[in-house]
């Protein structure tokens, strides 16, 4: 956990939650999936998990948990697909023809590493709808918001877990208004420090 003034593409945040190990380490990814699956295993039929922001490892474990042999699990014994859209030259999310069939007519769970403003989630939701998928829910490691367009976001961590956490759209950023310079640029890959700052700790 780092505290400071972080700028993402869509928002400014007071903290950066480093979930790198959770996205890339076997044990932590499996644990994350074990928490998230509880929201869906007995209630939602899931055919495909659409992974955003490098969440494919967690998504793979999540698919395995959803499909485990459990007489009460909705997806028991099913083959759950894991796919990731790509950005075309215009910045639009697309699925290539060989992957589109895993979304079209399927019950889809959207998995995102972190949700702050919800804009990335909305773009992914629009992509899923365009390709004919039926969105069954949104799962995230961290989410600053409870819903995206009335779709609940089920997350492991929320702002309540981070004392003093603030997120805002760029024009409304209280840190900018207070004259605090940006410490780092952040995205789904990590963050890049712009200057040394004692507040980042």
Region spans (language model):
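Short glycine-rich phosphate-binding loop at a beta-alpha junction
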Residues: 44-54
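Conserved acidic residues
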Residues: 47, 106, 136
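Short helix-terminating capping/connector loops at secondary-structure junctions
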Residues: 44, 73-77, 132-134
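Short, glycine/charge-rich flexible loops or terminal/linker lids adjacent to PRPP-binding catalytic cores
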Residues: 56-109, 116-120
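PRPP-dependent phosphoribosyltransferase catalytic core
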Residues: 125-201
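Short, well-ordered alpha-helices that flank and scaffold nucleotide-derived cofactor binding pockets
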Residues: 38, 64, 68, 126, ...
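Hydrophobic Val/Ile/Leu positions in short beta-strands of Rossmann-like dinucleotide-binding domains
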Residues: 51, 110-111
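Active-site-facing substrate-recognition patch
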Residues: 1-45, 188-201
């Amino acid at each position: 956990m780092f505290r400071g003034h972080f700028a993402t593409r869509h928002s400014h945040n007071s903290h950066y939650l480093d979930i790198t190990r959770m996205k890339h380490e076997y044990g932590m990814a499996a644990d994350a999936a074990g928490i998230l699956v509880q929201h869906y295993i007995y209630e939602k039929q899931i055919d495909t998990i659409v992974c955003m922001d490098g969440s494919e490892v967690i998504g793979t474990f999540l698919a395995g948990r959803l499909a485990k042999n459990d007489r009460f699990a909705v997806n028991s014994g099913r083959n759950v697909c894991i796919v990731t859209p790509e950005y075309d030259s215009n910045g639009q999310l697309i699925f290539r023809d060989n992957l589109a069939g895993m979304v079209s007519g399927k019950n889809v769970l959207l998995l995102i590493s972190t949700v702050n403003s919800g804009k990335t989630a909305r773009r992914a939701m629009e992509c899923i709808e365009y390709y004919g998928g039926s969105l069954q829910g949104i799962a995230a490691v961290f989410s600053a918001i409870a819903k995206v367009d009335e779709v609940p976001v089920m997350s492991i961590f929320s702002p309540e877990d981070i004392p003093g956490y603030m997120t805002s759209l760029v024009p409304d950023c209280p840190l900018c208004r207070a004259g605090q310079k940006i410490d780092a640029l952040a995205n789904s890959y990590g963050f890049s420090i712009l200057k040394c700052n004692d507040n980042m700790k």
